[in-house]
Amino acid sequence: MKIRVINPNTTASMTDKIGEAACRIAAPGTLIVASNPRSGPVSIESHFDEAISAVGVIEEVRAGELEQTDAYILACFGDPGLLAARELTRAPVIGIAEAAFHLATLISTRFSIVTT
């Protein structure tokens, strides 16, 4: 199985750390491909940054489709471009924020988000 883990910002050092973390927990035989867009914000701090980064996510999913990627993970709390990415592929596209929210609702009926 090939999983493309997409860092929606352009910070390569962060992408490397994300890829390393994913590789540590991946099942044997799973290929993790960590990627980030060629252009876009170095950090996603505003609605504008989120909108620009969504374009990069779309480009990364298109590239993944050419490589026959089996699943995608958006490694950014805001899940930028999540719904658009799902329209481009039949493969699962999981946003880490959405996944965390779903898990939180299994633990409790109420939860909070603490951010800076």
Question: Positions of the model-derived regions?
Answer:
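N-terminal glycine-rich anion-binding loop in soluble enzyme alpha/beta folds
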Residues: 1-58, 116
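Short acidic/histidine-rich motifs immediately flanking catalytic phosphotransfer sites
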Residues: 64-72
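Acidic/His-rich segments in extracytoplasmic proteins that coordinate ligands and/or metal ions
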Residues: 70, 78-88
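Short, acidic/small-residue loops that bind anionic groups at enzyme active sites
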Residues: 86-108
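Short, ordered loop/turn segments at secondary-structure junctions
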Residues: 10, 37, 77, 98-99
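General beta-strand structural signal in soluble alpha/beta enzymes
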Residues: 33-35, 73-74, 93-96
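Short, glycine-/small-residue-rich phosphate/pyrophosphate-handling segment
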Residues: 13, 102-116
